[in-house]
From Swiss-Prot:
Family as reported in the entry's similarity comment: Belongs to the acetyltransferase family.
SUPFAM superfamilies tied to this protein: Acyl-CoA N-acyltransferases (Nat) (SSF55729)
Role this protein plays: Acetyltransferase that converts ornithine to N5-acetylornithine, which is likely used in plant defense.
One term of GO molecular function: N-acetyltransferase activity
Protein name: L-ornithine N5-acetyltransferase NATA1
Induction info: By methyl jasmonate, and wounding by the aphid M.persicae, and the lepidopteran herbivores P.rapae (white cabbage butterfly) and P.xylostella (diamondback moth).
GO biological process, one term: ornithine metabolic process
Keywords annotated in UniProt: Acyltransferase, Plant defense, Transferase
Segments for region (Disordered): 1-21
Amino acid sequence: MAPPTAAPEPNTVPETSPTGHRMFSRIRLATPTDVPFIHKLIHQMAVFERLTHLFVATESGLASTLFNSRPFQAVTVFLLEISPSPFPTTHDASSPDFTPFLETHKVDLPIEDPDREKFLPDKLNDVVVAGFVLFFPNYPSFLAKQGFYIEDIFMREPYRRKGFGKLLLTAVAKQAVKLGVGRVEWIVIDWNVNAINFYEQMGAQVFKEWRLCRLTGDALQAIDKLNI
């Protein structure tokens, strides 16, 4: 989805928001111009999950694979943006697949964002990318209906524990209901107790008896060489 044509007015609110200041959020579809932000977000997620040794994604790789199909028919990315000024309420007619979610928040603590300059979609406006969710269709055969699988959901550290992360999961769930999707599912690292508690509070079931299985790298190539 292209950015809305009516941009919010520039403002002079300092990078550190005063206590009790209102903040505004928008969840929108990512576009090819957002690839640098998506790449940085995935890398920060790899650092948080202690999996940087597995991180090999490049901006060019993301650009060539993320936007080859219409939203919700293949890989889809939502970006969460934060601003001290209201976002425009007009909907971009060129992007009929999704209407951005707009919310207003009361921030109880100042937001110190040392990486802010790396996550500004528009240098003229005080809008910062705070998080993302990446998901795609799957097919729960027991339901005989399409599902959504969330591959990644991530909030940058300065914006955690402020209610923003809930918006990303809610946006996917609302879109699932709108499209008649049977279920939404994802995995969570077992040591991330805060995330597990958060998901359970959202009403999600956490299946402790299931295990993730994966073939990749040399193991995947070895399977290809088997005679069957």
